Every structure is written in structure tokens, then in C-alpha cells.
Amino acid sequence: MKNFNLILVIGATASGKTRLGVELARQLEGEIISADSRQVYKGLDIGSGKDLAEYGEVPHHLIDIVEPGHEYNAFQFQQDFFEAFTYIESRNKQPILVGGTGLYVDAVVSGYEFVQLDKDLALRAELDLQPLEQVQKLLLELDAAQYEKTDLTVRPRLYRAIEIAKNKQTNPKPAKALPEIRPLYFGIQWDRKVLRKRIKTRLKERFEQGMVEEVQGLLDNGVSHEQLEYYGLEYRFVSQYIAGQIGYEEMFDRLNTAICQYAKRQETWFRRIEKHGGKIHWLQGSGDIYQQACEVLADLG
């Protein structure tokens, strides 16, 4: 048995993830699962960077599966992912996850247990008064397995994990077992200045392709400005431009800056993967990333 059953292609926005995922799928008889929180929506094409033509003959999953206006979340993604993953594996094909949205990837690899549970405001107020180390210790005592899955540096996530652990004690029931994921991470790395240039170039291309018209079409079809805020940076800023809140140049500059800031936050997420024991095989974007990935696969046997 090979030591991985899921290839993950990660990297900052505009790093070339889809292209690498497609090339690997062709080489390995694979199928792509998108881990992008916006590409699930029909009609969110240019702003979400679907690039469907790039897939060619390669089968892809979790793209264009819900209508705009539906609030799709990480719990639904986890369910849909494992359905696609099981289907791909059952046909002896290689699943390749291309992402994307950090929470979605975490939901798959970490096997988050999603629970429909209200916040315990009294408990949270009590935990607010305790040192972080004491809160971490409480979670460890309640549920060691949940402790291992949780980002221990973020209080809201710790609080949620404690709420889930306490709920398990009072309402024990067997969780639905999720398939085991053995990940192989490929990360695409660019010099920061080069990445910023790629982001700006891609943004210009998206406006030339009709991103403003795409957002106007969504509004015309009943998607509200408030819902567009939920669909991420491109839709948020273009919506503000259409509403007359900002001019075109200001919209472009602010959007470009916001995307670059988002790329920096993605780097923080990559470091967290490594901090928690994930091995990322970094590929240099300035070189032939496909060839670099093939060399890693050859070394792994």
C-alpha cells in the first residue's frame, strides 16, 4: 500500500495550483476535487477563478454544485468531499484535492467532527478569565483526541472544542467514521514580489474577461449585495463599485491590496500545517513545478 491516498495541491492564490493539479491527474489517472469555497457556486465563474477550460478531459468534482444564495459551509463540504473521494477510489483513480479554502482542507485532513451545537456563552465568559495554558489543559483532560485536532493558539477554536467535548460527555453517541486520509502535500512557492505581480496581472485579466458584468448578472438574478459580501473579496469590492460606493480605480487598488494580504494569511496557514506535523513538499514556482512534483513522487516510490 502506498503511503498516501490523497494528493493535496496547495499554495497562495494565483500560484498555479489548478494547472499542477491537472498535470498530475493526467499523469496518475487522477480526478480533481476542488476545495474552493466559492467554486461550488454556479455563476461565480470569473471571480472565483474556475478556469474550467484548463481541466480539459480531467474529471473534476465539487464545482458548480449549488445555486447562488445557498449558504454552503465546511460541514457540507466535508460530506461532499468524502462522497467524491470514496467514488474516485472505488474506481482505482487517484483523488487530487486542489485548494483553496484552508478550513475546507483542514476539515478533510484533520477529520473535524462537526456538531450542531449552540455556543455556551456562560462557559466562554468563564474561560475568558483563564490563562490560555489552563484552557488548553482543560481540553486535554476532557478529550485528548479533540486536543490533537485543535489549533491550540486560537481561543474561539479552543472554546468550541471544549463545548464539543462537554457535549460528548452528556450526549454520547458514536460518530460516523470517516475514511482515513493519508495526505501527500505539494505546495507551490513564489518569491513574494513575483507573486504580487502575478496577482495583479490575473486581476486585470479577470476584469477584461467581464468580472463586473458577472457580478451585475448575479445581482440581476436576485443575489443581494449582502450575499455577495459572503462570496469573498472580488465579489465584495465589485459589488461596492456597482452600488456606487467606490470608483473603479479605488475598487481595483483596494481589491488588489486585499488579495495580496489574503495571500500572506495563506502563508500562515501553511506554516500551521507544518507546525502540526504535516510534511509539505515545496515546489519553486519559478521552475517546472510539474517536473519537481514528479521527482518527489519518484523518490517516494
Curated annotation (Swiss-Prot):
InterPro entries to which the protein is assigned, alphabetical = Dimethylallyltransferase, IPT, P-loop_NTPase
Its recorded reaction(s) are:
adenosine(37) in tRNA + dimethylallyl diphosphate = N(6)-dimethylallyladenosine(37) in tRNA + diphosphate
Cofactor(s) needed for function: Mg(2+)
Family per similarity comment: Belongs to the IPP transferase family.
Protein name, UniProt field = tRNA dimethylallyltransferase 2
State its role. Catalyzes the transfer of a dimethylallyl group onto the adenine at position 37 in tRNAs that read codons beginning with uridine, leading to the formation of N6-(dimethylallyl)adenosine (i(6)A).
Keyword Ion transport carried by entry: no
Annotated site residues (Interaction with substrate tRNA) in this chain: T101
What are the protein's GO molecular function terms? ATP binding; tRNA dimethylallyltransferase activity
Q: Which residues bind substrate?
A: T13, A14, S15, G16, K17, T18
Which domain of life, per UniProt? Bacteria
EC assignment: the record states: 2.5.1.75
Locate the residues binding ATP.
G11, A12, T13, A14, S15, G16, K17, T18
